[in-house]
Swiss-Prot record:
This is Phosphoribosyl-ATP pyrophosphatase. GO terms for molecular function: ATP binding; phosphoribosyl-ATP diphosphatase activity. Belongs to the PRA-PH family. The keyword tRNA processing does not apply. It catalyses: 1-(5-phospho-beta-D-ribosyl)-ATP + H2O = 1-(5-phospho-beta-D-ribosyl)-5'-AMP + diphosphate + H(+). The lineage of its organism: Bacteria, Pseudomonadati, Pseudomonadota, Alphaproteobacteria, Hyphomicrobiales. Its EC number is 3.6.1.31. Pathway: Amino-acid biosynthesis; L-histidine biosynthesis; L-histidine from 5-phospho-alpha-D-ribose 1-diphosphate: step 2/9. The gene is hisE.
Amino acid sequence: MNEFDLSRLEGIIAERANSGDTQSWTARLISAGMDKAAKKLGEEAVETVIAAVARDKKALIAESADLVYHWLVVLKIAGVRLDEVMLELESRTGRSGIAEKESRGKPPESAA
């Protein structure tokens, strides 16, 4: 099993964000701001969906990695820590997805 995890990636992103290294994609993306980072996140989400629909496992793995990385960059820019997201997910365990959505005033989606 790989020892690399999201917390470690979050730490690397934080280090690079503060590095001032003009050769760091992370530093450049963060300095470009939320609009640029969110756009990249959206692009990676679409590419992940395309890979999933195509049932291309190799592409799905690669695009998922890109998606997670860009998601963590967006969280960094927004000042949201990964542990805050994990606490939210933890608070939802033990509840059905339908009940959780209803608690937020969202109608449940059809699975069809």
